[in-house]
Regions:
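Short loop/turn segments that connect beta-strands within beta-propeller blades
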Residues: 42-46, 101-105, 143-146, 187-191, ...
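Conserved beta-strand positions in repeat-built beta-propeller and related beta-rich domains
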Residues: 22-33, 90-94, 131-137, 176-180, ...
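Surface-exposed loop and turn segments in beta-propeller and other repeat-based domains
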Residues: 1, 48-73, 107-115, 149-160
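Short coil/turn segments that connect the beta-strands within blades of beta-propeller domains
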Residues: 17-19, 85-86, 126-127, 171-172, ...
Length: 226
């Protein structure tokens, strides 16, 4: 693996077929708050490239990015999904959710939970999305419209997932980070659960882009290759 950042990564987005946008935390010496840096990793060249905040917001929130980001305040922390009608669903790590219409107006908010435990993350799957419920050892697929539960894999007394805390997806698999030390994957076609054949320490996120994977940890980010 190649280390690509020494800072905590708070968001990763697909930018194109061979590029990803990363957002890294930047400490603010004058206060307890923090700023962020944005950069692109080009998988073809292995180089970092400059990207603007506006390009990141456009990719994440669509054409009404200005209106949505201003209403959110902290716009890097939630997962986001742009729906077919250009409405945008967001979910924060604590389970807080919001739905913005195509004009960028907040039309619905609430808390997404399962058995009173918060559900977080968005991994897109057609007109659905996958999320994790760490407190219930469950990975759940929801219909994006209305956030209604479709499929649940795992459960509090099952061994399929151990404290799942992050989920992402590519065209074929859903990737689930468990207990900060392993990654499991769900086949989207069969719902079979298997292990990713690598083990990582202190993992906070796992994003697959073709043959490449971005692995985020407590101390930075790495690029791995099949």
């Amino acid at each position: 693996m190649i280390k690509i950042s020494n800072r905590q990564i708070v968001d990763v987005l697909r930018f194109s077929d061979d590029k990803a946008v990363l957002v890294e935390k930047k400490p603010n010496p004058d206060s307890t708050s923090y700023g962020v840096n944005y950069f692109i990793l080009n998988f073809s060249t292995g180089e970092k490239e400059i990207v603007t905040k506006d390009a990141y917001l456009l990719k994440k929130y669509g054409t009404k990015r200005k209106e949505i980001s201003e209403k959110l305040g902290n716009f890097v922390m939630p997962g986001a999904m742009i729906l077919e009608d250009r409405s945008v669903l967001v979910i924060y790590p604590n389970g807080e959710t919001g739905m913005f219409n195509a004009e960028g107006e907040l039309v619905r908010d609430g808390l997404l939970s399962y058995n009173d435990s918060p559900v977080c993350c968005i991994a897109e799957d057609g007109n659905c999305f996958w999320s994790v419920c760490e407190g219930e050892n469950a990975v759940i697929r929801y219909f994006a419209e209305g956030a209604k539960m479709d499929i649940r894999i795992g459960g509090k007394n099952q061994l399929t997932f151990d404290r799942p805390h992050f989920v992402s997806a590519d065209d074929k698999y859903v990737y689930v980070c468990c207990n900060h030390n392993s990654v499991r994957k769900i086949d989207k076609a069969t719902f079979t659960v298997t292990d990713v054949n690598r083990r990582y320490n202190d993992i906070t996120g796992y994003y697959k882009f073709g043959k490449f994977a971005i692995v985020t940890t407590f101390d930075g980010a790495y690029c791995d290759k099949d």
